[in-house]
């Protein structure tokens, strides 16, 4: 359904979950509010955040909640092409503009006309391309490579980067005037370590997706200790890394319904296990037994989740265990860790 909000048409028949934006944590609730607010206007948006945090999903969500929802959404990775190819892709070219240009070709700005264009990794764009993009934003028109006439375009521009563009401006690598053009509105996507209470929800979502993709008749589940192991890791690759790990787990435990902690440790590549060990110095101690390690991991995960949720009951719900059982397990772990110290 399309409705009017403050004079701007927006799409209300839409859920962030439809795009895989999953989470009930405070950072994700704040992100959802930002997406809704940003969708109500047509200003340019700069989405920042670490790699793997879902910046393109946020861009798609803004588009899907906007009045342009039924119109094109065009995405391009600005860091994946050299200057010549990027310019041709964005602005199009005339026949004979360069060797191999046997016929004229519309660019992505024209393809996105009346809709939205998403410029991913805009921080990788060369200074020469930045100048041409700035002109498009100023004039609302593109000039194809090899052409003389300008073609008007009505496009909402959303850009994203994992770079600190402020530092890039200071280093002379990014134009300040372009920055102010693309960053009228800004959204920062939270890292996974900033919203660890969302990990169980994401894990269940990715398990369902992987089972469907692999046509597995079973629905995989992860036991409590396994979920704890996934929760305490800091996930430097964020949601993208978590999704890949879950897909690997489903593929390597295809015949089993329950994924145990041992299965997780056996399925993960040695490089990731080593990385996890170095990132968990508080709980990973030399000469620890597996039980000692799991006890420390449970306590760390419990404290992290309880701090984020503010409630023992909500923490138990996230870990898919009743509150009394969780309390008993936490207390037993505390006693064992105390005796081992």
Positions of predicted regions on the chain:
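Conserved helical "switch/dimer-interface" subregion of ABC/ABC-like ATPase nucleotide-binding domains
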Residues: 34, 65, 93, 132, ...
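Bacterial C-terminal helix-turn-helix
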Residues: 45, 54, 60, 281-341
């Amino acid at each position: 359904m399309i409705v009017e909000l403050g004079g701007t048409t927006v799409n209300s028949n839409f859920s962030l979950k439809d795009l895989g934006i999953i989470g009930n944590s405070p950072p994700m609730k704040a992100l959802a509010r930002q997406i809704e607010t940003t969708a109500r206007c047509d200003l340019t948006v700069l989405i920042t955040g670490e790699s793997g945090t879902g910046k393109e999903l946020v861009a798609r969500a803004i588009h899907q909640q906007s009045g342009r929802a039924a119109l094109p959404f065009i995405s391009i990775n600005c860091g994946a092409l050299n200057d010549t190819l990027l310019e041709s892709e964005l602005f199009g070219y005339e026949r004979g503009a360069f060797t191999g240009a046997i016929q004229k070709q519309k660019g992505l700005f024209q393809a996105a006309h009346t809709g939205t264009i998403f410029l991913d990794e805009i921080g990788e764009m060369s200074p020469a391309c930045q100048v041409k993009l700035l002109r498009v934003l100023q004039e609302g028109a593109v000039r194809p490579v090899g052409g003389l006439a300008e073609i008007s375009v009505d496009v909402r521009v959303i850009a994203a980067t994992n770079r600190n563009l402020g530092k890039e401006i200071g280093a002379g690598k990014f134009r300040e005037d372009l920055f102010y053009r693309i960053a009228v509105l800004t959204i920062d996507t939270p890292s996974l370590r900033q919203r660890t209470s969302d990990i169980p929800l994401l894990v269940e979502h990715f398990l369902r997706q992987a089972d469907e993709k692999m046509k597995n008749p079973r629905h995989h589940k992860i036991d409590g200790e396994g979920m704890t192991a996934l929760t305490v890791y800091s996930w430097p690759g964020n949601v993208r890394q978590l999704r890949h790990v879950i897909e690997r787990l489903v593929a390597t435990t295809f015949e089993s319904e329950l994924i145990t902690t041992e299965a997780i440790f056996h399925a993960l590549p040695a490089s990731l296990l080593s990385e996890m060990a170095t990132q968990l110095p508080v709980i990973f101690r030399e000469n620890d037994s597996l039980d000692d390690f799991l006890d420390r991991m449970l306590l760390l995960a419990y404290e992290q989740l309880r701090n984020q949720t503010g409630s023992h009951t909500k923490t138990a719900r996230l870990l898919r265990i009743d509150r009394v059982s969780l309390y008993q397990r936490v207390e037993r772990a505390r006693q064992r860790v105390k005796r081992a110290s």
